[in-house]
Amino acid sequence: MEDLPILYSFRRCPYAMRARLALFISNTKCELREVSLKAKPEQLIKLSKKGTVPVLHLEPKKIIDESLDIMVWALKNHDPGNWLPKDTITMEDTLSLINNCDSEFKHNLDRYKYGPRFNVEDTTIHRGICETFIKDLNNRLHDHTYLMGDTASLADYAIVPFIRQFANTDGEWFYNTPYPLAHKWLDKLLASDLFLSIMTKYDPWHEGQTPIYFHAEC
């Protein structure tokens, strides 16, 4: 097969999930290299100083190592689901919502889910801050089926991996919160063929193995 982009990924990482979602829906053929976070391959570390996933290696001296940038790059090449907003106002709203997810929500999600790692004794404080974001999503869903309209778009797929992580931290608590529209939105996206397709389990990549090709037609 011709030289293809190489995606360094980790199945359960929400940043890597959002990258895989966009690459898959755009039918961007690439080689998938599953990474063990406990034994990151030397090739990944050489490519990106951050040493974190996802990293998309496009050519010898070109990489994309920010998940949202990978999404936008893939969708600008091919966007059959019309994920990218067509007007400036909706795009600005989309990016603002994603930024809220990636900044305040993710900061507090980490301290809720991994309290001891951050020396947090009362994780419910951080859960409560995260809850305000869930409330915002629920309010948006009063007006339409998805966050930006009646079809799923960039905002939904960039954010849903993080809401999945939040919900899985304490599912009983999450599904007893008064945000039924957010619950329904999450469940619908997680049960979709698209999401299930990007969650296939693979062993960690090692040098010399048979390549795994990741795209919508495989």
Where on the chain are the PLM-derived regions?
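GST-like domain detector, emphasizing the conserved glutathione-binding G-site
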Residues: M1-E131, N138, D143-T145
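A structural signal for the main folded, soluble domain(s) of proteins
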Residues: A22, S192-F195
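Short, flexible loop/turn segments with low-complexity composition
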Residues: L84-T90, L196-H206
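Extended, well-ordered alpha-helical scaffold segments
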Residues: I125-I129, T177-A191
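Alpha-helical transmembrane segments in multipass membrane proteins, preferentially the mid-helix core
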Residues: D136-L137, A167
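Surface-exposed helix-capping loop/turn segments at secondary-structure junctions
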Residues: N139-D150, L194-M199
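GST superfamily/GST-like fold recognition
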Residues: L147-E172, P178
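Acidic/histidine-enriched, glycine/proline-rich intrinsically disordered or flexible terminal extensions
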Residues: Y202-C218
